[in-house]
Amino acid sequence: MKIAQIAPLFERVPPKLYGGTERVVHHLTEELVRQGHEVTLFASGDSMTSAKLVPCSDMALRLNPAVLDPIPYHMLMLEEVRRQANGFDVLHFHIDLLHFPLVRSLAGKTVTTLHGRLDLPDLQPFYAAFPDVPLISISDDQRKPMPPVNWVATVHHGLAPDVLPFTGQPRGDYLAFLGRISPEKRPDRAIEIAARVGMPLKIAAKVDKADAAYWLNEIEPLVRRYPNVEFIGEIDEGQKGEFLGNARALLFPIDWPEPFGLVMIEAMACGTPVVAFRCGAVPEVIDHAVSGFIVDSMEEAVKAVHELDRLDRHTVRATFDRRFTARRMADDYLDLYRALAGGAQRVMPIHAANESGAGPGSARVA
């Protein structure tokens, strides 16, 4: 198939540091190319891909201090997509909602994966105005706040199986927190859990400008107060395997409707179990007492850390291999692309089809 992947321009594909959406687009694109499809990637000019790259900005917008407004760059990208649209069987958008007016006339050959939270009140009237645009959720939980829209599938994220090495015997005896310093990610909970169990905590996270006050006023004082807490800062892909692989567990103590939580499957790829609070997509990603523990309170989180020895790291990795590889993700999307190309208007959620006996990597037309 001739497939266009349209990525955000904020980070390169794949991102140098933080950037979950761009990382997923990278793994999907590379796997589609590996399977022999003709893939074109619309992304920043510094992106690295096996697909044909259409550069839509010189570099990732977040890394360019001259960029004051990202919207014009994305609109220019959409104009280029519109110009080339007839050359593709499928246009797969990963840029939230900017393209919706454009794709109404192309709805039969487009899909849009929504990567972010959908519970913001401003979004409800917008999505209600576009009930014909085919949408893909990255978890069933992500859909809950939405008005009736044209959901065609749920496709869970996946990663290339060799991107993060399995570690059977971690060299560290620490807990890990990886991602972003923000109130909804609850690094304060991670610090409290580590203090209560008496284990070191390593925090590898970025601090956005929007969260600078939260870091300075809330989290940095806690880091200074507890000698067992080490703040590493933002790490790159090459550092992530060692950081996660040598941890006893990843702490994922969120209290917001996390649409997916890519870091959870990154930890699982390393064989590292996850202790996660029951929010958002967590119950869809973590197999309780298999790849980690799902908890509802600080007391349960502390108990889960004490019970980590019950979990086998080989089983954690096997769960990743069964559920969260890039091949499984690409196969799910290909089933969807083909169903839509064949005129299907609705497709069952991918994992719902699996649970009903359709088998892994399959979508069923509803």
Region spans (language model):
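Catalytic cores of nucleotide-sugar-dependent glycosyltransferases that transfer UDP/GDP/TDP-activated
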Residues: 1-366
